[in-house]
Swiss-Prot record:
Species in which this protein is naturally found: Cupriavidus pinatubonensis (strain JMP 134 / LMG 1197) (Cupriavidus necator (strain JMP 134))
Biological processes, Gene Ontology terms: ATP synthesis coupled electron transport
Protein name per its UniProtKB record: NADH-quinone oxidoreductase subunit K
Source superkingdom: Bacteria
Keywords: Cell inner membrane, Cell membrane, Membrane, NAD, Quinone, Translocase, Transmembrane, Transmembrane helix, Transport, Ubiquinone
Enzyme's top EC category: translocase
Amino acid sequence: MLSLAHFLVLGAILFAISIVGIFLNRKNVIVLLMAIELMLLAVNMNFVAFSHYMGDLAGQVFVFFILTVAAAESAIGLAILVVLFRNLDTINVDDMDTLKY
């Protein structure tokens, strides 16, 4: 039987991997978005673990709202990246240094 500590350690490991992904790869915007999404999933897993072990469904319902917002964030972020790639022919973070193109 898995305890709450197992889920919290796994969530902390996923969160740490996403932070390392953000710090090691600052050039590619797609990898940055994937690392941020992994960070949100680690937090969601902790919400589900806490709500399961406390016997309350509020945390699990809250996860659905977080996933909805994360999906909208990803869609908007990828749409912005498509527009930037069409205008600049790159998705490198260093090349995106001005606000107007």
